[in-house]
């Protein structure tokens, strides 16, 4: 199963990161290319405890950002 999340703001990025870190094939989509670039490099555009750790774990597993 592939899951697509449109909008990588606070809720979208958190949800996308957790789903991917749990092993779901996940695609996060956002119109802001600069934000997508940061996220693809494992950097969150905002602070949430442990989010960057979860994001990087998801990127290693099954997370794509577009």
Question: Model-found features: residue ranges?
Answer:
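Structural/interface elements that position substrates and couple domains in central-metabolism enzymes
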Residues: 1-66
């Amino acid at each position: 199963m592939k899951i697509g999340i449109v909008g990588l703001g606070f809720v979208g990025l958190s949800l996308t990161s957790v789903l991917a870190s749990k092993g779901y094939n996940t695609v996060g989509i956002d119109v802001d290319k600069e934000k997508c670039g940061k996220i693809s490099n494992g950097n969150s555009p905002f602070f949430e405890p442990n989010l960057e750790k979860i994001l990087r774990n998801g990127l290693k597993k099954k997370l794509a950002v577009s």
